[in-house]
Amino acid sequence: DNDINLYGSLSNILLNKKCVYSMQNKCIYKSDAINRLCMLFQIITSEKIFYMEKSLVRVKMSPRRDENVENYEYRQLVSNINCDELTSMNNICKLPKLKKEITFFYTSKGEYYNLKPIADTAANRGYKIKFTKDKKEKAEIGVYCQHVCYPENSRFSLILLHDLAQGHNRWPNLWENERWNGFDIGIVPGKSWADRWRKCACFYYANPRCGTFEFGYPKSDCINDIGILNRGAEVKKLLAMPDRFTVLYAPSWENDNKEDDFIKSLQNLDINLMVKQAAWPEVYQHIRGNIEYMRSIHEGRFENLYYIEPEESIMTALSLCDMVVSDESSVMAEALMFGKPSVAVTDWMIPDEDPPRPASVPMDYVIKCEKKDLREKVLSIMNHSEEYEDILQKGRDTFSNQGNVCKDIMDAIDYYTQGGTEDSFMSRKLESEYRAFNMWN
């Protein structure tokens, strides 16, 4: 009995002849786009519609050159809409004012430190804040950064990355497996991630309800924070670490004696070797065991080897080092916030699969080598760091909006949940590079 099938997005419409003939719409505007919009309004307000989450063709969009005619005719179209209809349409988009309560969901120390700058800004604005490890806990406003989340338990939800290399083995389409369409706001940390999102935004599952924004990476607001600098100086004094070139070892996973490889490759150089392992949860007891064993056989045996506790913020370690050595950890990206290069050892294995796989390092802002060449690569960076300026410049594209990240995030929360009026953050809203299209236009 239905006359209309609407496939994919609102740009893909298949109508039967009976429906078209019954419509009162005529091509009364010069703009084809406004004529189509007029027809679409009639369809939505008076007919039955079926939705399918599959588009037929995708085309790359090009910038529109002149919108004056369409803007004028759009205003004409809106002026002809019944006042009751217009009011009901506005009510659909208007969100109710929520309680000033924000719950931050985290499952590791790394996630906690990623979210903490936002929480501090929220507290300064009078929000009641809470951190929880229960990903299914109900919340008024929920801020998430995990692979698997439950935004349906929050009245308003935000999603951001917990890791700048997140899903790197699936780039550019992180969102096929980690879907954002259940959230209200999505946040990417910089230009390179914004480009990935734009390429995938034609898929419905990449689109939060209120949009995706290039707000930046919360931790990047803190790189010049006096608290981090003071904490770095305090740790350096506690370790009695001398003033000389310092190489930080910070892997994603500790396995297959990686720490041993690192120390043996560099122990005879006139440098500081600094180890900062991640604070793994108890469910990864085998990795915690590897970390403890490596420390037990190395600590105290080398005069230039220093350990920073796993529970310490990685920002402290990054403030102290001159370069980073890792496997595929996002620490290498975070080092770029401090203008420091990183080396990825590509033949170190990653045990998140069975059998373990080689490190996956698609990032173009990381210097890469095999473990047999690690010593020479470190010496090269120490003595000729200008060679790698192009790589460092690519890394700077990873971050946007430093110094204003948390402000813009909270402005968006205020705007959508508290009736806030500050909307300058809207300039950071992203648009798809492609759009769904059909073959019958």
Range-by-range predicted roles:
Residues K372, E376-N441:
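C-terminal amphipathic helix plus adjacent low-complexity
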Residues R155-L161, E311-D354:
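A donor-sugar binding/catalytic signature common to diverse glycosyltransferases
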Residues E101-G227:
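Active-site and donor-binding regions of nucleotide-sugar-utilizing enzymes
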Residues W180, C202, A206-R209, S330-F399:
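Catalytic binding pocket for nucleotide-activated donors in carbohydrate/polymer assembly enzymes
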Residues D1-E73:
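Conserved nucleotide-sugar donor-binding catalytic segment
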Residues R288-P310:
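Nucleotide-activated donor-binding/catalytic signature segment of Leloir-type glycosyltransferases, i.e.
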Residues E111-L115, F215-R295, N401-K407:
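Conserved catalytic-core segment of nucleotide-activated headgroup transferases in glycan assembly
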Residues D3, L14, N71-K97:
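C-terminal, non-catalytic tails of nucleotide-sugar-dependent glycosyltransferases
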